[in-house]
Structures are given as structure tokens and as C-alpha cells.
């Protein structure tokens, strides 16, 4: 079995359907003795250029280990699913299990946002003293 990295761009109007679609693709891979090494939902992002007058898409990344027949079946499902506006399949030498740079950056951004304290309007009232 070979290792593959798949990126799907889903129509933004179908973002709520992504979970069900991903579950179907995972089930197909696992039913054919494949393995999911990494799954990341990057959410809705701006496209570099419009595709069919669409400016945003919902991105999903998979790293899988599967055989050629299952991969061909997945690609056919992607091709005939109108909700998927683009798909990319790359063969990898090894299984990639670590978090992608995009996901790491998003985690760091969330952590910075959580540690940044916003001034509270009640703090000004707590500092006065009664004379």
C-alpha cells in the first residue's frame, strides 16, 4: 500500500455537509484495509483565484495509506460530487502524521489570542479609594 496526501476544496454553501462527506471517505478507505494517518479540517478560506465565480472554499486535508483501486474509487467520487470544486492527490514516500504548518499557525494564533488580556471596563472602578 502507498501513502497519499489529499486536499479537497468543498463549495462554501456545502460546509455543513463536510463532516458527512469526510466520514464516507474514511469509511471507504478503512473498509478496504487502508489507514487514515492525518485528517485536518482547515475550514472556510479565501481562494487564491475565483473558481466558477466562487471566492471561498472549505478545505479538508487527508493523509492516507491505501491501495490503487481504493484511490481510484475516491478520485471518482470526488469527480462526480458537485460539492467538491477541486481535489488534489499527491503520492508521499512516508506516512505524514504530524500537524501541518497551517494547523500549527492556527493553534499559535488561538493561543496568542487567549493569552492577550482585554482591558475590562470594571477595572477602572476598582482602583478608587474612599477618603
From Swiss-Prot:
Region feature Disordered, mapped onto this chain: 94-131
Cited InterPro entries: Ribosomal_bS6, Ribosomal_bS6_CS, Ribosomal_bS6_sf, Ribosomal_S6_plastid/chlpt, Transl_elong_EF1B/ribsomal_bS6
Gene Ontology biological process terms in this record: translation
UniProtKB keywords: Ribonucleoprotein, Ribosomal protein, RNA-binding, rRNA-binding
Gene Ontology terms: cellular component: cytosolic small ribosomal subunit
Domain of life per record: Bacteria
Entry's Gene Ontology molecular function annotations: small ribosomal subunit rRNA binding; structural constituent of ribosome
Signal peptide: none
A Pfam family annotated for this UniProt entry: Ribosomal_S6
Biased composition (Basic and acidic residues): 117-131
Function: Binds together with bS18 to 16S ribosomal RNA.
UniProt family annotation: Belongs to the bacterial ribosomal protein bS6 family.
PANTHER family: MITOCHONDRIAL 28S RIBOSOMAL PROTEIN S6, SMALL RIBOSOMAL SUBUNIT PROTEIN BS6M
Protein's UniProt name: Small ribosomal subunit protein bS6
Organism field: Psychrobacter cryohalolentis (strain ATCC BAA-1226 / DSM 17306 / VKM B-2378 / K5)
Name of the gene: rpsF
